[in-house]
Amino acid sequence: MAGLRQIAFYGKGGIGKSTTSQNTLAAMAYYFGKKILIVGCDPKADSTRLILHEKAQSTIMQLAAEVGTVEDLELEDVCKPGAGPFNPEQPSPSGGWIKCAESGGPEPGVGCAGRGVITAINFLEEEGAYSDELDFVSYDVLGDVVCGGFAMPIREGKAQEIYIVMSGEMMAMYAANNISRGILKYASSGGVRLAGLICNARMTDREYDLANALATKLGTQMIHFVPRHNIVQHAELRRMTVVEYAETSTQAEEYKELARKIVHNDLKVIPTPMNMDDLESLLMEFGIAEQFDEENVGKKAEA
């Protein structure tokens, strides 16, 4: 496991984190021959569906509830090979492949979903899922709530490289700044580092410049700007990644370039998160937010 790189994708809910991570990891396997284990750490259990061509993978916590305890599970019950060119038995021309596991969590409103992340990762480690043949383990983590459970890949030093999926929208930037705070908190004890921002474009005003400025403020890089394209949704409807669905498309080239940058990335930093005033000032600088005035609170836009 000496050469194993453990990375994590964090980001605000609904930002396209799982879609971006799966398309990027698919490109890493397909074009660059990387052997990857994806560990989904989102209660939605949607971190592997495009790789598996399935609606949703059965989760470790779900299967454990069916058989009694996690100890009653076998690794092959919860760790599934990718479909098509991502299957280890029939790997891509480059030799890359992907295996998938989803941590899952309790029923909505009951218990701690973050606890499922901890239980799942411990089980995978104990059962030998982190084999020597792997190049990458990737965690796909819910990023709105950086609670103890969801921060586990950061807190326990499981993931050394964090990629934050964001956009030029205020709440996505707010979440990115919050996640950076979590990384900073555990940087000294766990060795975790921020490896870059991935801007999953929403086509807002001056989005590229704003994302780049946020990256600079956080002391990192905008590792790639992923343009918006309908082909991503078309591929999703077939439960496929873009590199498999439309290999010659310009969007496949975007994910290939992002994959290349991650494979060769050596810029991993302790972030410098901003306070809320500085974040709002950044938005004002780029014309996204107006100069704040208490007298305007609750007032409608002028006609």
Swiss-Prot record:
Binding residue positions for [4Fe-4S] cluster: C112, C147
Which residues are annotated as modified residue ADP-ribosylarginine in the UniProt record?
R115
Q: Which Pfam families does UniProt cross-reference here? A: Fer4_NifH
Cofactor binding notes: Binds 1 [4Fe-4S] cluster per dimer.
- Cofactor list: [4Fe-4S] cluster
Q: Name one GO molecular function term.
A: metal ion binding
Q: Which PROSITE patterns match?
A: NIFH_FRXC_1, NIFH_FRXC_2, NIFH_FRXC_3
Binding site residues for ATP: G11, K12, G13, G14, I15, G16, K17, S18
Query: Known post-translational modifications?
Result: The reversible ADP-ribosylation of Arg-115 inactivates the nitrogenase reductase and regulates nitrogenase activity.
- Cross-referenced InterPro entries: NifH/chlL_CS (IPR030655), NifH/frxC (IPR000392), Nitrogenase_Fe_NifH (IPR005977), P-loop_NTPase (IPR027417)
Q: What is its EC number?
A: 1.18.6.1
Q: What does the record list as GO biological process?
A: nitrogen fixation
Question: Keyword set for this entry?
Answer: 4Fe-4S, ADP-ribosylation, ATP-binding, Iron, Iron-sulfur, Metal-binding, Nitrogen fixation, Nucleotide-binding, Oxidoreductase
- Subunit details: Homodimer.
| PANTHER family linked to this entry | LIGHT-INDEPENDENT PROTOCHLOROPHYLLIDE REDUCTASE IRON-SULFUR ATP-BINDING PROTEIN
Q: Which family does it belong to?
A: Belongs to the NifH/BchL/ChlL family.
Q: Which NCBIfam families match?
A: nifH
Record's HAMAP family? NifH
What name is this protein filed under?
Nitrogenase iron protein
Encoding gene, per UniProt annotation:
nifH
